[in-house]
């Protein structure tokens, strides 16, 4: 009889020691996985938590409640999350989520899990199936005073939640209206890790969804229209393409004026083309790969597909904010188009929706946009995208080391002419009245491939919108230029340089 009580005293001492430091040490959690067969893991047991020395470790539980029937989803270890700090019991407070989630600190604290609605409804406690009595069970029934302290902690946490919505985990709640097709992300805990970018409508977080990294774009409530527009574009039939950003889910977090709107997409560690070009000089083949996949993505976005892979009609879509910051790069430098908050669909027999003229990023605005002289037809909007593509292609060439000459530090289009923060009036003067474009360096024209690519760039940013190339034509040209240059030997490079037209490029005639 002495040994169990000695062990009990030792465990109580360790709990008190953790409490004295302001945290309960978590080293082991109850483990359970409802999808153990599919994921090829154990169904249940104990899980030993591992993490960085300066990070706190927690346990978590997630479950569903279908008409009073409790269906356990997962239990296990949860890494450092301020929402779990000093919580000795696993308590979920959401009103009616798809999946309940709770986390706590302390060994095996997720054995029991509780739902305590914020609205003050009745507390509902869910217990696992009866098992053989354990030391932890004896401890749970012995330390009743801890329950009172836990209720005080829960009250403080409830007040904190009402002050600011937490970022520790996510359960998906769709805004009223038809939800976009997406997997049940709410079945899997999602944890925000770090801010990767800040933009016009909010910030982008790197987050962890089980074993995968994802990107979470968070919009404030006042930018609901942009969030809703981008969600609708992602939900358009046929938007699954290797050169378009992969959509995972959309979510509304929080309540009333403190609500936030989330878009969850694939995460690409190399970031945007802008960021990559700032820190890297690229080779000829890398330039061609980025340019070809980027133009392929825009070509597909612009395309009208009557019946796309059985999903239905994919309408033509104009991006309207095409720039290097909105082109992401996969690990192999394959380009992926992102940020469809200003995009507009062109469906037969329907108005295109919000088509205000001067939208997008000033630096990348076509002359007709800067002038406010837009023809509000589909082709006009697609040609505006093509002007911006010409500028992005110029950015690629400016950081390519293929030519025999210096590679300058990365600069945005027109940064050399009018600086980093040009006004609308300055751009109108330079782009519209003086018809200037970013400078094409002389030594670029001495490389056969870059020389041909510069011709394509000039035909993309042509002042006459109707003379601009289509994205599909750019894709064909880049592919042809790459093959022609890579197929030549050093002995015949000179002859190619003397006449750019040695390679028959696809016709300039626009197919938009």
Swiss-Prot record:
Protein name (record) = Activin receptor type-2B
Bilayer-crossing residues are 138-158
The record's note on quaternary structure and interaction partners says:
Forms an activin receptor complex with activin type II receptors such as ACVR1B. Interacts with VPS39. Interacts with DYNLT1.
Instruction: Name the cystine pairs.
Output: 29-59, 49-77, 84-103, 90-102, 104-109
Q: Which family does it belong to?
A: Belongs to the protein kinase superfamily. TKL Ser/Thr protein kinase family. TGFB receptor subfamily.
Binding, ATP: 196-204, 217
- Please give, as recorded in its UniProt entry, the membrane topology of this protein: Single-pass type I membrane protein
Supply the InterPro entries for this chain. Answer: Activin_recp (IPR000472), Kinase-like_dom_sf (IPR011009), Prot_kinase_dom (IPR000719), Ser/Thr_kinase_AS (IPR008271), Snake_toxin-like_sf (IPR045860), TGFB_receptor (IPR000333)
Task: Name the cofactor(s) required for activity, per the record.
Answer: Mg(2+); Mn(2+)
On the Cytoplasmic side, which residues?
Answer: 159-512
Matching entries from CDD domains are given as:
STKc_ACVR2b, TFP_LU_ECD_ACVR2B
What reaction does this enzyme carry out catalytically?
L-threonyl-[receptor-protein] + ATP = O-phospho-L-threonyl-[receptor-protein] + ADP + H(+); L-seryl-[receptor-protein] + ATP = O-phospho-L-seryl-[receptor-protein] + ADP + H(+)
Annotated keywords: ATP-binding, Cell membrane, Disulfide bond, Glycoprotein, Kinase, Magnesium, Manganese, Membrane, Metal-binding, Nucleotide-binding, Phosphoprotein, Receptor, Serine/threonine-protein kinase, Signal, Transferase, Transmembrane, Transmembrane helix
Enzyme Commission no: 2.7.11.30
* Highest taxon of source: Eukaryota
Quote the PTM field. Phosphorylated. Constitutive phosphorylation is in part catalyzed by its own kinase activity.
Q: Name one GO biological process term.
A: pattern specification process
Topology: which residues are Extracellular? 19-137
Location(s) in or outside the cell: Cell membrane
Write down the glycosylated positions. 42, 65
Interaction with DYNLT1 as annotated region, ranges:
491-512
Q: Tell me which GO cellular component terms the UniProt record holds.
A: activin receptor complex; plasma membrane
State the protein's purpose.
Transmembrane serine/threonine kinase activin type-2 receptor forming an activin receptor complex with activin type-1 serine/threonine kinase receptors (ACVR1, ACVR1B or ACVR1c). Transduces the activin signal from the cell surface to the cytoplasm and is thus regulating many physiological and pathological processes including neuronal differentiation and neuronal survival, hair follicle development and cycling, FSH production by the pituitary gland, wound healing, extracellular matrix production, immunosuppression and carcinogenesis.
GO terms assigned for molecular function:
activin binding; activin receptor activity; ATP binding; metal ion binding
User: Where does the Protein kinase domain lie?
Assistant: 190-480
Q: Which residues form the active site?
A: 321
